[in-house]
């Protein structure tokens, strides 16, 4: 579980993906932003890749162009962890227990949180 690379989408998303993947495209893109970022992500997905839509922080939900999906044999998957808990709380509990077991057994590890200083933005 994890990512090979993390990209700042505000700094040339497509160019960064091309550089990191030797022009192949990303196998998986996790998109909590939607809107223009989703549109650009669709152009960055590798053949048979998956684009995970987990939110629309931009305020504009994702709208998939099916021609991009067909050309690349790619998938767009919508996911929210909250819905799983509401639809099947027992499933969510079982999965949580499995993850905690893996953590206790050392099969997975948690990363140490990294911090950054938050500065209050001056009022206009």
Segments from the language model and where they lie:
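C-terminal hydrophobic helical "lid"/dimerization subdomain
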Residues: 90-124
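Active-site capping/gating segments
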Residues: 81-93
């Amino acid at each position: 579980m994890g990512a090979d690379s993390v990209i700042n989408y505000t700094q040339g998303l497509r160019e960064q993906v091309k550089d990191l993947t030797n022009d192949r495209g990303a196998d998986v893109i996790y998109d909590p932003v939607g809107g223009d970022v989703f549109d650009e992500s669709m152009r960055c997905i590798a053949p048979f890749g998956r684009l995970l839509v987990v939110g629309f922080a931009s305020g504009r939900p994702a709208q998939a162009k099916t021609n991009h999906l067909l050309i690349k044999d790619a998938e767009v998957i919508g996911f929210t962890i909250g819905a799983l808990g509401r639809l099947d709380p027992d499933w969510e509990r079982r999965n949580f227990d499995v993850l905690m077991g893996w953590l206790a057994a050392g099969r997975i590890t948690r990363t140490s949180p990294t911090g950054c200083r938050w500065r209050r933005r001056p009022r206009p």
